[in-house]
Amino acid sequence: MSQNWQSPVERRIVPNEIIPARLFACFADVDPSAGPALDKTYASGEDLPRALSALHRNHLSHNDRLGENGSIWEAGPSANFTRVLYIYATPDMESAKELMRDDPFYRASCFSNDGWMEWSVHTPYWKTGEPMRGMIEGLMRGIGVLPSYPAGVSPTISVINVEVVTPPKLFVSLAKADAGRIKQIENDDKARRPIPSFLVQHAFNRLGPGGTTMMGYDWECGPSADSLYDLTIFSVGSIEMARQLRENDPFTQQGLFYDPEYFEWFIHTPFRKASPGRRAALEKLLGEGEQSPRF
């Protein structure tokens, strides 16, 4: 080998916070008698009714503690306070459910009809930890998005440290998934049998140049552990754009993802990740609930 030969350089994005290995997502409805008042409080600072105000302070205190200790990964309401999405980082599903049951809003039936799933985030791949990141990067090398190297050649890794910043707008899309067909495709791939071209197109749609990950449209995306759902949180400017991205996914076009729901979502917990449009209101409300505000 030439003495002037230099190993290839591969850039690796390293975030300040890695997505936990296990996440449990909870969707719940908000009591229609409380939602409009909460909406006005966060939109214009209007005072809550006395009973709801005290309950809300206890709810915020409960969630703030869980956000600070890492038990809540991300949590918050829809834009109009009709439903919530809470994502817990706990050892198991039952632990996550116990934390929700202890929420003052849940105990007072302000939250109800809760549905649960274990959630595995696949993209953005650079926000995930091992072994998920290695699996996704292996897929990217297999389809030519990342380079492959001959035996004996190892790249020099150039690290790019990034701070993950919550965007101004987030839109949740929860779609049902055809777990049977997805499992069959995965089994065919493992057995080196022919796979549908739309599987590769789906990977390119998410991971390739101009795809949703590379363009920054994926805040966090991936399947439920049982493959019955796909939960995608889009970082885009409008719900129409989120809908278009979902509809452009080859898995949607081929019927593997279907019946999607959409809503704008605000992160309230943990406070350090709060959506920009809610940060000032949360700072004020959290401060009101403390003898010595943290902010």
Spans of features found by a protein language model:
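Conserved, structured core segments of small domains
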Residues: 2-295
